[in-house]
């Protein structure tokens, strides 16, 4: 697809694929057309007939065979003759326009020599000849009406040319003297394609000579002299003229010959082996001799030998680009092929095919044998442990299920219509399968063996459509194949690659480059279509594959992984394009895509291929006949193209060699690696090799590598590269050193390119000249690909801008102007068409109706103007280069390896330089500006062009992503996509690009979180590359623009790569550990691994990785939060470990006990903060987690270091003295004192945050702040490592997490997740599964090592639970004789046994009853006693041996565990049994009294009381046991009920529109009276909420929704602004928002109260609902999550006032104050509120609504006075959701009320509440007599039911929604309540019960309390009387009547069965909580039984 996109532009009769430009097979076609051979197809026959009649008519020629048809000789002769008669003046008017060109180039800091300095006359002949031929070509392609009978002749004086029927006739005027053609006056004839090839050759020569002429002046010594070029061309023409077609074989050796000469010049650096040079030159001489052109060859070699400089010689590559050239094979291979092919092969075609099979066999067998352990393969060079050796000996490369091979999938294509299979398909598809089907099952994903039937079906279809019978094809193929199962057609998937520098991307312009990226991406989406077998994923991706491979990689520090990814020049790239286009065009047609496929494999020239596309089956006899026919004509055998069989292809068996290739390569690489003696892993597949070398290295403490170590690794790495290079060259493989990627860093950030400087570019070009073949630059402009290597070599090696640029301009003005701007992705738009005709230009395709004018005239501009315009357009376009048009300016060194963004940046830099230089022609300047859309008025403001990111379109501020998106959409729309799926894919991509566009807009650095968006467009591998492209484009641009004049491009690129350093490729967070399913096996495994660990392990990130987080200045916290939910990245503990491995192998473990040391470090930090040496001390303090020490040494060590750093005695700091206290009470939370727990105002939480961060910690979760402090310190350490200074503020880092901080801590320190018990089994009872797995004894084999005591404790549990013989268990733990077992720690054993017994009892309870009620410890103890006595014989069996040994017994007695003093030892059986029973009972009591946890359902929350009990218990336990070790103390909580499910919210999403809320309240006016100020003494108010977790008195959270109903009506105005302070979620605002839908809102609520439905049934409206409803209305979004509700902070008050002022100064504002009074000193909160309201009153018309709830009227009045803002009257609002047991109401203070200093007295308030009560009674009476209350709406019922049922659960009554029926409820409570008390037996026949009948001596107060509550409920349900005076209720007596049944409260039955009364009145507060909750039942059953 060079020069012209011929196959697309010029549609001909379908030629075989081989008839492309340089294929000698055209000769066969012209032989058929000229009667020398029988035509092979109907088409050719007809074409010949038409040609015949034309010749007869115009030339009187009867016999076509008399015509000259040797195009090779003809064109050589024509070239020679025509060049000699050309004029020496170059015909280009560019010379007239020299001045603007000169000033333009001056603007780029270059000087242009005078035009006379150039010797144009040397370039003129070729240039002028080319111009004439090009004119003929364009003219001939115009579409015009032709009169029948007229001839169209074209003249290239004196040659005449005529185009007839796809051939070209050449003849001369009869009058002219010269004879150009051999046949005199008769015309010579060649196919049209040959004519095109000739023009292409002329064009290429003209350009080469012109280039040489220009460079000779601008930069001497860079290019060969024009004379040398002309001489070479002349000699070549001479050779071709003499030898004809076969001489082309000699030209194919041209580049290898140049390489041999280069090798001489460059010497060792080039590294050519001697035998290679001799082979090539020998071949050339031999060939020349056979063709009798030795003298011509010698002359060529002389010219070569005259070149003494490497650089000009280097430009000789590509002179014969249009001819193929062979690859260099190893010597062995060449010999093997020669042995076969040197035999005379033309005797018989059958022999020839036989020889080809021999070659194939030679390749196949030679290596496959080695592969299957042939004795010939010497494996002794490999070390015995070598992975490779192992594989080879087993007989195959390991591929089953290896992660590396997951991308190998076969596709068997079912075609919907028959394809005319072109040549080259059959053999290659058959064979490519052959290589990989050695071991079929391994390759088929599902693993089923045998062949997929679809292959067979496809094959049969193919045969049926192409052959008369199956027998035909089988018979014909048997000559080549002998195996039936080889007859397959299968297509192999290759991963396409998304790399800007990939196949086809070299110097592409912007649009095609972009298109290619999209094309590949789409191709990947259309089922990763066909091309070749090699793996070409990106380097990063391959590195990741390598990580997966190296399972044995070393975890310790002090080892560095160096990864090398080798890039080898492969030997099959050259001919792909030509030989495969036909195949691919068929596929494209089938898939409905435009050119999408581009590649197959070719290898050997002499491969004969059976062609299925021909009309007849390929039978050998028929073939022999044709062969003879050709031989008779003297045609060269290998180049015959005939029916059914053809040759001359370099292709067919690449697939076969793939494995062979891999093995050769592996052996070579392994040999080099063995010498290094380092641990290494090699991954090879095809020509991709990745080596991982593990190098031991010294590392500093902080994780950095010392300088000398770096140098050592670097030199080692380079050494390995060089030895690899020389080793591989022995196989004829050249290594592209500069593309051999190596990571020599401690970790892989970005890619480190390492380039040893030894003329790498030259080697790259010389050794793989094919890299710049047409295959790579499919869409590059004509002159670039025509020049081939030279231009790219210049731009990369020479970078001479003037020469290249000038050349581009001359090309443009010479008529190629359109190419500068209008290259389309389908090919070229011809310059002089008035209207662009895209697609293929051919008259036959244009369907013209009669009479329609078909004029397509050439538009003619006046000559002068046209050239001037052209020049200006060219120059202005070239300034903006590839961003907008053609690439006339060369690419700077290596820039094409980088992204589009960098390219644009580079372009803008050049443009800016030129515009600002002042040399530029003003018209060019204007053009550039208009291209950038700069309005003319703002000419001066040019900086705008260069300072906005990527801006190509300034006026619209469009950035690069937008441009890319726009271009992409535009291009994709041009395609007519017939394939539905593909169209959908493209639409998807459009969407993806749009999202990406939005996310990338203006991003300085891509946030790693964007990765997921990118993945939706491309797949994972691509996204890596995709993201990196844009990662720091803005930075690049800034750098380029700031100092473009003095900044060399190299520095720019270095800066660029530093930018990329910060962009790590590991950016996904570790996924959360999944909850274990309820499978016994899994549960046991988990339990075993988590058992008995006292120390929690955390992985310490190395400092280098730790530095990666973003620091946030706490003062900007809010702003940052709203932009970005910050997350802490998960750092691997070792560079380069993949996540999977990281999960399985822990890094460096850091012990810490609970959180003990954290508060200490934090306090120490506080006290050190003012000290000038703080930084140093902080570093030391925070290094804590990387010191591998344990226990208190850790703190001692830190103290020592700090003292040293600060020169003070740190131990004297008061905070560190707290250490002893903490260590003494190390319990559940590792000794955190009460002050450090997050409850209460003056605690550690508040202090530390205010001091450390100067404000409260801004987090949505309520957590123990000590945990955050450490995190802060670690962040500080990172911060210091980066910045080395502190600005007085700690950097904040927040965690994105949806649950409590424990998880954050686990994530941060990499502590394994505490396993959550989650039952997924459908059948079994969850609790049963739980009991049988989680709490059993772990399997001993799995236990971690333990000290003897813990082990004994565990053993005790096992004895109680497992019932196995004692000896058996003990011997598992210790290998000691039986008799010494009794000397183990008996106390531990017994306590463990006690735990086991308790657990066993609970388990048996569960098994018997199917449910567990919450059992108090006291009752449990009694039940256990009974249980132990029932099972005493069992206990005697298990622990009896303890009492048979005196020492053990005395130890038990000493501890007070055995109150039984035996008379003698051994004991009798009875005594033994009793002793065991009593001792076991005692042990269980000890366990219960210390609240030791029996491992149970995970605990949800831990509060202060737990901490206290555990600390107390720890101390008790130590005194009981005399054991100083801390124990793991937890509290027993069996909340597991059989049928209670968690209450789930059913709130619909339209909650905000709900009508259900409407409830009318009562309004009562309060008017202030004058009172002396000190009239009522201030009372400290009691807390209304008990801290006992068993009691709920928090009040329903959604209550605020209901309480605020109807207030809007009472306020009676529409406010301008609503302000909400306090009040959790701000549910209180909902009723207001319903009423005033348009009012804006400011939220200052406590978002940290976002619980879910807590376990006690509280409900929270999901925040999403509220926020979704309100977000559009919020004025200040940031405040949403702020902690403004703490209005004791003055800054918060100021902020709130400022906001109100800013938004609605003087407007009507409604303020809702939901601030509860708990949790802060009364006076402070009161005064703050008062202050806030008064100040707000001044800036607006304030109406406020306050929630007030107090326990006494005095407090209520006191509170109202403090908030009423001196108003004379306030209003109380009350409805039935307000509590009646306390004084609770909404107080509404209106702004328009008159002011006065009066106060509201207690009496007024009391009256108001009395009024409310009266009103209620009246309502109640009314309703009961006249009408019934409406039923509650179902949603409210659900809310209230969840609340009520949770309270019942606390009282051991599990209710379901079905029980909410009055009759059933009364029945349930009456019947089950007495069951709370255990009676000896059911005494139903007795009418009373004595105390002694109740099992417990003192029935617990809890039980009685529960009974009181239940009987209170009964009374309400029966009579509708809901008493609210808790004080009197608690004092009453509860009666139980016969049945036994519970009586309603206050009702004394005739027959009392039992009665109970609370002993103490302390339960009042509890009762308030319980009753206020149960009062909601009134809503369900308001009026009692009617």
Curated annotation (Swiss-Prot):
One Gene Ontology cellular component annotation held by this UniProt entry: host cell cytoplasm
Pfam families, per database record: Mononeg_mRNAcap (PF14318), Mononeg_RNA_pol (PF00946)
Binding positions (ATP): 1619-1628
Catalytic activity: RNA(n) + a ribonucleoside 5'-triphosphate = RNA(n+1) + diphosphate; a 5'-end (5'-triphosphoguanosine)-adenylyl-adenylyl-cytidylyl-adenosine in mRNA + 2 S-adenosyl-L-methionine = a 5'-end (N(7)-methyl 5'-triphosphoguanosine)-(2'-O-methyladenylyl)-adenylyl-cytidylyl-adenosine in mRNA + 2 S-adenosyl-L-homocysteine + H(+); a 5'-end (5'-triphosphoguanosine)-adenylyl-adenylyl-cytidylyl-adenosine in mRNA + S-adenosyl-L-methionine = a 5'-end (5'-triphosphoguanosine)-(2'-O-methyladenylyl)-adenylyl-cytidylyl-adenosine in mRNA + S-adenosyl-L-homocysteine + H(+); a 5'-end triphospho-adenylyl-adenylyl-cytidylyl-adenosine in mRNA + GDP + H(+) = a 5'-end (5'-triphosphoguanosine)-adenylyl-adenylyl-cytidylyl-adenosine in mRNA + diphosphate
Domain of life, source organism: Viruses
PROSITE patterns assigned to the protein according to its UniProt record, in alphabetical order: RDRP_SSRNA_NEG_NONSEG, SAM_MT_MNV_L
Chief location category: virion
Entry keywords, A to Z: ATP-binding, Host cytoplasm, Hydrolase, Methyltransferase, mRNA capping, mRNA processing, Multifunctional enzyme, Nucleotide-binding, Nucleotidyltransferase, RNA-directed RNA polymerase, S-adenosyl-L-methionine, Transferase, Viral RNA replication, Virion
Enzyme Commission no: 2.7.7.48, 3.6.1.-, 2.7.7.88, 2.1.1.375
Residues annotated as domain Mononegavirus-type SAM-dependent 2'-O-MTase: 1592-1788
Compartment list: Virion; Host cytoplasm
InterPro entries assigned: Mononeg_mRNAcap (IPR026890), Mononeg_RNA_pol_cat (IPR014023), Mononega_L_MeTrfase (IPR025786)
Positions of the RdRp catalytic domain: 560-757
Gene Ontology MF terms in the entry: ATP binding; GTPase activity; mRNA 5'-cap (guanine-N7-)-methyltransferase activity; RNA-directed RNA polymerase activity
Quaternary structure and partners: May form homodimer. Interacts with the P protein.
Free-text function comment from the UniProt entry: RNA-directed RNA polymerase that catalyzes the transcription of viral mRNAs, their capping and polyadenylation. The template is composed of the viral RNA tightly encapsidated by the nucleoprotein (N). The viral polymerase binds to the genomic RNA at the 3' leader promoter, and transcribes subsequently all viral mRNAs with a decreasing efficiency. The first gene is the most transcribed, and the last the least transcribed. The viral phosphoprotein acts as a processivity factor. Capping is concomitant with initiation of mRNA transcription. RNA-directed RNA polymerase that catalyzes the replication of viral genomic RNA. The template is composed of the viral RNA tightly encapsidated by the nucleoprotein (N). The replicase mode is dependent on intracellular N protein concentration. In this mode, the polymerase replicates the whole viral genome without recognizing transcriptional signals, and the replicated genome is not caped or polyadenylated.
Family under the similarity heading: Belongs to the rhabdoviridae protein L family.
Annotated protein name in UniProt: RNA-directed RNA polymerase L
Organism whose genome encodes this protein: Infectious hematopoietic necrosis virus (strain WRAC)
The encoding gene: L
């Amino acid at each position: 697809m060079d020069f012209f996109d011929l196959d697309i532009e010029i549609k001909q009769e379908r030629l075989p694929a081989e008839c492309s430009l340089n294929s000698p097979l055209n000769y066969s076609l012209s032989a058929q057309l000229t009667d020398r051979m029988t035509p092979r197809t109907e088409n050719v026959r007809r074409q010949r007939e038409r040609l015949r009649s034309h010749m007869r008519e115009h030339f009187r020629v009867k016999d076509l065979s008399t015509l000259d048809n040797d195009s090779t000789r003809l064109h050589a002769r024509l070239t020679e003759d025509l060049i000699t008669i050309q004029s020496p003046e170059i015909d280009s008017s560019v010379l007239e326009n020299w001045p603007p060109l000169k000033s333009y180039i001056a603007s780029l800091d270059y000087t242009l020599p005078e035009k006379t300095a150039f010797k144009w006359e040397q370039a003129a002949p070729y240039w002028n000849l080319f111009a004439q031929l090009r004119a003929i070509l364009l003219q001939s392609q115009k579409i015009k009406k032709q009169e029948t009978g007229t001839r169209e002749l074209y003249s290239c004086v004196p040659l005449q040319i005529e185009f007839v029927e796809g051939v070209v006739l050449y003849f001369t005027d009869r009058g002219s003297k010269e004879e150009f053609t051999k046949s005199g006056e008769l015309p010579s004839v060649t196919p049209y394609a040959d004519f095109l090839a000739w023009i292409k050759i002329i064009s290429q020569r003209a350009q080469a000579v012109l280039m040489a002429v220009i460079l000779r002046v601008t930069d001497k010594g860079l290019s060969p002299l024009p004379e040398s070029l002309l001489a070479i061309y002349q000699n070549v023409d001479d050779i071709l003229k003499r030898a004809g077609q076969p001489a082309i074989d000699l030209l194919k050796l041209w580049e290898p010959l140049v390489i041999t000469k280069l090798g001489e010049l460059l010497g060792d650096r080039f590294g050519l082996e001697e035998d290679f040079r001799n082979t090539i030159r020998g071949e050339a001489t031999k060939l020349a001799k056979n063709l009798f052109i030795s003298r011509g060859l010698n002359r060529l070699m002389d010219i070569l030998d005259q070149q003494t400089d490497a650089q000009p010689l280097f430009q000789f590559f590509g002179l014969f680009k249009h001819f193929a050239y062979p690859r260099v094979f190893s010597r062995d291979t060449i010999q093997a092929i020669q042995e076969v092919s040197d035999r005379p092969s033309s005797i018989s075609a059958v022999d020839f095919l036989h020889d080809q099979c021999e070659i194939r066999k030679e390749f196949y067998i030679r290596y496959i044998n080695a592969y299957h352990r042939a004795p010939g393969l010497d494996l002794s060079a490999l070390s015995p442990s070598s992975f490779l050796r192992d594989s080879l000996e087993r007989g195959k490369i390991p591929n089953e299920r290896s992660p590396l091979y997951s991308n190998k999938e076969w596709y068997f294509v079912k075609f919907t219509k028959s394809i005319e299979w072109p040549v080259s398909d059959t053999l290659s598809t058959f064979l490519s399968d052959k290589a990989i089907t050695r071991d079929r099952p391994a390759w088929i994903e599902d693993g089923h063996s045998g062949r997929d039937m679809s292959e067979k079906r496809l094959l049969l279809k193919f045969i049926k459509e192409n052959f008369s019978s199956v027998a035909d094809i089988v018979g014909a193929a048997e000559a080549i194949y002998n195996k039936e199962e080889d007859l397959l057609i299968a297509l192999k998937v290759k991963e396409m690659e998304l790399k800007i520098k990939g196949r086809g991307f070299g110097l592409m312009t912007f649009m095609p480059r972009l298109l290619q990226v999209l094309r590949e991406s789409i191709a990947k989406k259309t089922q990763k279509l066909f091309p070749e077998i090699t793996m070409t994923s990106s380097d990063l991706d391959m590195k990741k594959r390598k990580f997966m491979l190296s399972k044995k990689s070393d975890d310790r520090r002090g080892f560095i992984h160096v990864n090398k990814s080798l890039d080898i020049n492969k030997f099959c790239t050259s001919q792909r394009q030509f030989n495969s286009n036909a195949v691919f065009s068929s596929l494209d047609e089938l898939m409905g895509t435009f050119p999408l496929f581009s590649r197959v494999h070719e290898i050997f020239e002499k491969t004969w291929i059976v062609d299925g596309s021909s009309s007849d089956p390929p039978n050998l006899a028929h073939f022999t006949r044709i062969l003879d026919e050709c031989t008779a004509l003297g045609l060269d055998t290998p180049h015959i193209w005939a029916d059914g069989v053809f040759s001359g292809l370099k292709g067919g068996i690449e697939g076969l060699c793939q494995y062979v290739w891999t093995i050769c390569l592996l052996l070579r690489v392994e040999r080099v690696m063995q010498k290094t003696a380092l641990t290494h892993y090699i991954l090879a597949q095809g020509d991709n090799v990745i080596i991982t070398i593990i190098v031991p290295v010294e590392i500093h403490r902080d994780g950095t590598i010392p300088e000398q170590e770096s140098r050592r690794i670097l030199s080692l790495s380079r050494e390995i590269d060089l030895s690899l290079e020389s080793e591989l060259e022995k196989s004829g493989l050249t290594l592209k050193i500069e593309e051999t990627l190596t990571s020599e860093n401690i970790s892989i950030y970005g890619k480190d390119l390492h380039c040893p400087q030894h003329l790498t570019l030259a080697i790259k070009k010389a050794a793989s000249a094919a890299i710049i073949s047409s295959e790579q630059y499919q869409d590059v402009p004509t002159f670039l690909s025509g020049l081939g290597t030279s231009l790219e070599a210049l731009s990369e090696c020479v970078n001479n801008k003037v020469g290249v640029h000038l050349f581009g301009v001359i090309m443009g003005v010479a008529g190629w102007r359109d190419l500068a701007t209008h290259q389309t992705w389908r090919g070229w738009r011809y310059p002089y068409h008035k209207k662009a005709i895209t697609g293929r230009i051919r008259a036959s395709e244009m369907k013209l109706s009669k009479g329609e004018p078909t004029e397509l005239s050439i538009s003619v501009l006046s000559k002068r103007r046209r050239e001037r315009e052209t020049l200006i357009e060219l120059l202005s376009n070239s300034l903006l280069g590839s961003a907008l048009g053609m690439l006339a300016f060369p690419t700077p060194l290596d820039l094409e390896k980088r992204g589009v963004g960098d390219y644009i940046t580079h372009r803008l830099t050049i443009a800016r330089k030129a515009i600002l230089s002042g040399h530029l022609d003003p018209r060019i300047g204007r053009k550039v500006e208009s291209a950038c859309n700069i309005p003319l008025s703002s000419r001066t403001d040019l900086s705008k062009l260069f300072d906005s990111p990527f801006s190509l379109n300034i006026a619209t501020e469009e950035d690069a992503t937008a441009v890319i998106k726009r271009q992409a959409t535009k291009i994709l729309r041009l395609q007519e996509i017939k394939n539905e799926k593909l169209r959908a894919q493209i639409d998807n991509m459009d969407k993806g690009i749009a999202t990406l566009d939005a996310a990338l807009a203006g991003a300085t650095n891509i946030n790693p979180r964007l990765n997921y968006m990118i993945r939706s467009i491309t797949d994972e591998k691509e996204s890596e590359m995709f993201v990196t492209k844009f990662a720091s484009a803005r930075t690049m641009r800034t750098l380029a623009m700031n100092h473009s004049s003095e900044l060399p491009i190299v520095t720019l690129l270095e800066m660029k790569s530093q930018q990329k350093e910060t962009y790590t490729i590991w950016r996904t967070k570790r996924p959360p550990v999944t909850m274990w399913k309820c499978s016994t096996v899994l549960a046991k495994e988990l339990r075993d691994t988590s058992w008995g660990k006292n120390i929690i392990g955390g992985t310490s990130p190395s400092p280098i990785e730790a530095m990666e987080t973003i620091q946030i200045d706490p003062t900007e916290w809010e702003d940052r939060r709203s932009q970005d939910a910050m997350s802490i990245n998960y750092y691997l503990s070792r560079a380069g470990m993949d996540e999977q491995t990281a999960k399985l192998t822990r890094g460096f473990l850091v012990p810490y006990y609970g959180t003990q040391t954290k508060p200490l470090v934090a306090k120490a930090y506080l006290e050190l903060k003012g000290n000038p040496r703080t930084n140093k001390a902080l570093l030391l303090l925070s290094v804590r987690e990387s010191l591998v020490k344990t226990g208190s040494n850790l703190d001692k060590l830190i103290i020592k270091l700090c003292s040293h750093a600060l020169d003070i005695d740190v131990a004297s700091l008061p905070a560190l003295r707290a250490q002893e206290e903490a260590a003494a009470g190390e319990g559940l939370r590792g000794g955190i004192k009460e002050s450090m727990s997050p409850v209460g105002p003056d605690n550690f939480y508040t202090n530390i945050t205010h001091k450390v961060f100067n404000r409260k910690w801004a987090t949505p979760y309520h957590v123990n702040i000590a945990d955050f402090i450490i995190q802060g310190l670690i962040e500080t350490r990172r911060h210091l490592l980066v910045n080395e200074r502190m600005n007085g503020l700690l950097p904040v880092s927040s965690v994105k997490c949806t649950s409590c901080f424990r998880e954050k801590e686990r994530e941060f320190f990499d502590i394994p997740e505490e396993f959550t018990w989650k039952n997924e089994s459908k059948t079994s009872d969850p609790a049963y599964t739980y009991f049988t797995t989680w709490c059993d004894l772990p399997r001993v084999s799995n236990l971690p090592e333990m000290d003897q005591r813990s082990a004994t404790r565990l053993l005790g549990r096992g004895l109680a639970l497992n019932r196995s013989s004692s000896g058996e268990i003990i011997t598992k733990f210790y290998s000691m004789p039986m008799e010494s077992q009794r000397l183990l720690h008996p106390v531990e054993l017994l306590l463990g046994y006690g735990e086991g017994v308790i657990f066993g009892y609970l388990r048996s309870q569960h098994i018997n009853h199917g449910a567990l009620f919450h059992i108090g410890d006291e009752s449990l103890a009694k039940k256990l006693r009974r249980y132990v006595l029932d099972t005493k014989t069992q206990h005697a069996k298990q622990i009896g041996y303890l009492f048979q040994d005196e020492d053990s017994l005395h130890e038990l007695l000493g501890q007070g565990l055995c109150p039984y003093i035996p008379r003698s030892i051994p004991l009798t059986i009875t005594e033994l049994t009793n002793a065991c029973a009593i001792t076991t009972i005692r042990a269980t009591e000890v366990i219960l009294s210390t609240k030791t946890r029996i491992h149970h359902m995970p605990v949800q929350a831990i509060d202060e009381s737990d901490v206290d009990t555990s600390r107390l218990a720890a101390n008790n336990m130590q005194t009981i046991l005399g054991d100083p070790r801390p124990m793991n103390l937890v509290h027993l909580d069996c909340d597991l009920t059989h049928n209670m499910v968690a209450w789930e919210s059913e709130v619909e999403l339209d909650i905000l529109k709900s009508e259900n809320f409407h409830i009318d309240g009562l309004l009562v006016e309060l008017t202030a009276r004058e009172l002396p100020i000190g009239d009522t003494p201030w009372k400290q108010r009691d807390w209304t909420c008990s801290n006992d977790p068993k009691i709920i008195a928090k009040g329903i959270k959604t209550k605020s929704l209901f309480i605020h109903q109807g207030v809007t009506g009472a306020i009676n105005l529409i406010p301008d602004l609503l302000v909400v302070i306090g009040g959790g979620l701000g549910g209180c605002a909902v009723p207001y928002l319903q009423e005033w839908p348009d009012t804006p809102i400011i939220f200052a609520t406590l978002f940290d109260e976002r619980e879910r439905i807590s376990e006690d049934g509280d409900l929270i409206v999901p925040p999403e609902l509220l926020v979704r409803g309100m977000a559009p209305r919020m004025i200040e979004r940031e405040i949403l999550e702020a902690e403004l509700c703490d209005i004791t902070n003055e800054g918060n008050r100021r902020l709130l006032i400022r906001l109100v002022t800013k938004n609605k100064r003087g407007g009507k504002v409604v303020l809702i104050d939901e601030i509860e009074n708990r949790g802060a000193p009364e006076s402070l909160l009161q005064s703050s509120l008062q202050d806030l309201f008064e100040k707000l009153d001044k800036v607006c018309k304030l109406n406020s609504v306050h929630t007030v709830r107090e326990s006494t009227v005095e407090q209520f009045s006191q509170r109202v006075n403090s908030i009423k803002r001196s108003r004379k009257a306030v209003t109380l609002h009350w409805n039935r959701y307000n509590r009646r047991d306390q004084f609770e109401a909404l107080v509404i203070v209106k702004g328009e009320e008159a002011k006065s200093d009066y106060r509201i007295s207690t009496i007024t308030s009391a009256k108001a509440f009395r009024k409310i009560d009266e009103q209620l009674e009246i309502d109640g009476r009314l309703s009961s007599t006249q009408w019934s209350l409406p039923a509650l709406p179902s949603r409210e019922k659900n809310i209230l039911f969840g609340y009520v049922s949770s309270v019942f659960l606390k009282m051991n009554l599990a209710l379901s929604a079905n029980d909410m029926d009055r009759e059933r409820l009364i029945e349930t409570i009456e019947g089950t309540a007495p069951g709370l008390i255990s009676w000896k037996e059911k005494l139903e026949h007795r009418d009373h019960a004595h105390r002694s009948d109740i099992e417990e001596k003192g029935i617990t107060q809890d039980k009685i309390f529960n009974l009181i509550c239940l009987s209170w409920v009964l009374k309400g349900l029966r009579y509708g009387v809901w008493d609210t005076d808790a004080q009197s209720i608690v004092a009453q007596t509860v009666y139980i009547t016969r049945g036994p049944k519970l009586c309603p409260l206050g009702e004394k039955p005739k027959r009392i069965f039992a009665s109970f009364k609370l002993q103490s009145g302390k339960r009042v507060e509890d009762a308030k909580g319980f009753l206020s909750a149960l009062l909601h039942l009134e809503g369900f059953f308001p009026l009692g039984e009617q």
